[in-house]
From Swiss-Prot:
Monomer. Binds 30S ribosomal subunits, but not 50S ribosomal subunits or 70S ribosomes. The gene is rbfA. It comes from Mycolicibacterium paratuberculosis (strain ATCC BAA-968 / K-10). One of several proteins that assist in the late maturation steps of the functional core of the 30S ribosomal subunit. Associates with free 30S ribosomal subunits (but not with 30S subunits that are part of 70S ribosomes or polysomes). Required for efficient processing of 16S rRNA. May interact with the 5'-terminal helix region of 16S rRNA. PROSITE patterns: RBFA (PS01319). Residues 124-162 are annotated as: Disordered. GO terms for molecular function: ribosomal small subunit binding. It is found in: Cytoplasm. Belongs to the RbfA family. This is Ribosome-binding factor A. PANTHER family: RIBOSOME-BINDING FACTOR A, CHLOROPLASTIC-RELATED. It comes from the Bacteria. The keyword Cytoplasm applies. Its main location: cytoplasm.
Amino acid sequence: MPDPARARRLAKRINTIVASAIEFEIKDPGLDGVTIVDTKVTADLHDATVFYTVMGRTLDDEPDYGAAAAALERAKGALRTMVGAGTGVRFTPTLTFTRDTTSDSVARMDELLARARAADADLARVRSGAKPAGEADPYRESGSGVEPGRDGSIGDDDQPEY
């Protein structure tokens, strides 16, 4: 019987082990700037997907996603060994590394929201100078303070007849 709470605990532990191993133990220059973001473990505890993101050397540099993916593939065996030693489970999960695209999605959503705000501002600018096409209320009878009913009469008997 799958235990989702156990899978979450194992994912959290794998996340910690892999992140600290990349930072302190594995000396691959391709892993510089790699940050482990999240880990998901299947319910049967046999597969773990580790999500990572890559930062550039400076703010202006584009991250090297290809080098980071290649370095993670090279280090996959050593990382799995460390996960097995650090978790103490009967079967060490297979590690799969996937680039986290959340930041790309956030940037895209920010761009779409900025475009929507600009379109709203243009519409408000156009709307501010607009006037109704005709009278303000073309159905109102002039001179009379009371509006006629559906049949043209003035009174409280405007209820539908059944």
